[in-house]
Structures are given as C-alpha cells and as structure tokens.
Regions:
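Electrostatic cytochrome c docking/interface patches
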Residues: 1-16, 114-118, 143-153
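C-terminal capping alpha-helices of c-type cytochrome domains
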Residues: 1-3, 73-134, 140
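Long, ordered, helix-rich scaffold segments
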Residues: 4-7, 12-15, 43-47, 71-72, ...
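Sequence context surrounding c-type heme c attachment/ligation sites in exported
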Residues: 7-22, 31-34, 50, 92-96, ...
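The canonical Cys-X-X-Cys-His
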Residues: 10, 17-28, 53, 69, ...
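Sec-exported extracytoplasmic/periplasmic mature domains
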Residues: 15, 46, 58-62, 74, ...
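Periplasmic/extracellular electron-transfer cofactor-ligation site
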Residues: 15-38, 62-65, 111-116, 148
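Gly/Gly-Pro-rich "capping" loops immediately C-terminal to redox-active cysteine motifs
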Residues: 22, 26-56, 68-82
Length: 153
C-alpha cells in the first residue's frame, strides 16, 4: 500500500508532461477513448500481474517491438529504475524504485483517482466504468506475468 506521499509522487509521474499515461490510455470517456491506443489502466489489476507490468513499463519495445509506448521512460541508476524525465522536488531523497512506485499506483488505481488525474490534466471527466477498448494488433507476450528464466526481479 502506498503512503499518501507516494501516491502523490506516483500521480505526478502518471500525469507528467514528459510521459502523460492518459494521453494514450483509455479512460472510459467515449470522446477520449475513440482516439486511445492503449488499454484502460483500471483493467490492469484484474488482468495482469505487477511484475509483468513493471517489465512492460521498463521496456515495452522488448516485449512488443513497434508498440507506440516508448522504452526510454526509465533508466537504471544505483540498482533501481528511475524516471528519465524531470521529477518534481517531492522525489528528492526518495531512494526506492520509480517503476515499482508507478506499478503499485496502477494496481491501486480507482475510477475516482483516474477522474482526479483526468481533471487535473484538463480533460473531460472519465466514466466510472473501465473501457474495454484495447488495440487488438499488439500482442502482449505473457500478460499474466510469468517471469522468464534468469529474471532477477
């Protein structure tokens, strides 16, 4: 469970201008979702495993070459993954893994929290129901998160 400070930090990554997750991910808002190219993250908890989502966030191109999600959002630093873009001052002194922070946030994401982020980003409000809209041309290898041999995480 994330602390209130960690939730705020994760929210700032999730909605950053350097990597605005909801720019591409469906939100349940029909107007937004008709152009969305990625699944609604409210569906992650019921369909995916956290370790797989973390691997996807770190290197989506390695899992599905050609996907529109970039693989350079995080970089390895001192045995942890850190956001490659600018981070707010609240991240000073935070020595934990940024990808894990974001994954934990995604797996705790609620419709209310998603609406809060959408509103803060100046978008129309998302519905309370997750949209099932997912690009069908992207094959997500091992979406249930079985770790590959040699995976140290």
């Amino acid at each position: 469970m994330l602390t209130a400070k960690e939730t705020d930090m994760a929210r700032s990554l999730f909605s950053s201008t350097a990597a605005p997750c909801l720019k591409c991910h469906a939100t349940g808002d029909p107007q937004h979702d008709k152009a969305a190219t990625a699944p609604n993250l409210l569906l992650a908890r019921g369909r995916l495993k956290p370790d797989w989502v973390e691997r996807w966030i770190i290197d989506p191109q390695g899992i599905s070459p050609g996907t529109s999600m970039p693989s350079d959002l995080f970089r390895r630093e001192n045995n942890r993954w850190v956001f490659a873009g600018p981070t707010p001052p609240s991240f000073q002194g935070y020595d934990k893994d940024h990808t894990r922070l974001l994954v934990d946030y995604i797996f705790q994401l609620t419709p209310e929290e998603q609406r809060r982020v959408v509103a803060a980003m100046g978008r129309t409000q998302a519905s309370t129901q997750p949209s099932g809209s997912v690009r069908q041309d992207v094959s997500l290898s091992d979406p249930h998160g079985a770790a590959s041999a040699g995976d140290s995480r």
